[in-house]
Amino acid sequence: MSANSPPTIKCNVVTHYIEEQSEPNNQRYVFSYTITIRNLGKGSAKLLSRYWLITDANGKRLVIEGEGVVGEQPEIKMNEEYTYTSGTIIETPLGVMQGHYVMGTEDGETFKAEVSPFRLAIPNILH
């Protein structure tokens, strides 16, 4: 393990229900999510892979794993950020998504950057 601690990574998520692509009568609810990944540490961090756990209101779970995000493995320099938008489909009007990124440091170490659970919900479903 390096004497230097890994960079501090903060993630901000904004979700959006895509009504025009959704089909509630067929249990198809489409959501986009935009994630901004900020590197608040010292040194660069490269996003190597992602892990997502998506759970709908019925408890149905879907795990998504893969290299990078949206076809990229961005290197995020100190005090910089990377933003991308992707999407998911669930069978209920409410769900939750959470996960992490595996990041690589300049010295070849890897660490997890956690993404706290965030809600997927059609507008006005929750008061």
Swiss-Prot record:
InterPro entries per record: ApaG_domain, ApaG_sf, Uncharacterised_ApaG
Signal peptide, first to last residue: none
Start and end residues of each ApaG domain: 3-127
Domain of life: Bacteria
GO biological process, one term: error-free translesion synthesis
Record's protein name: Protein ApaG
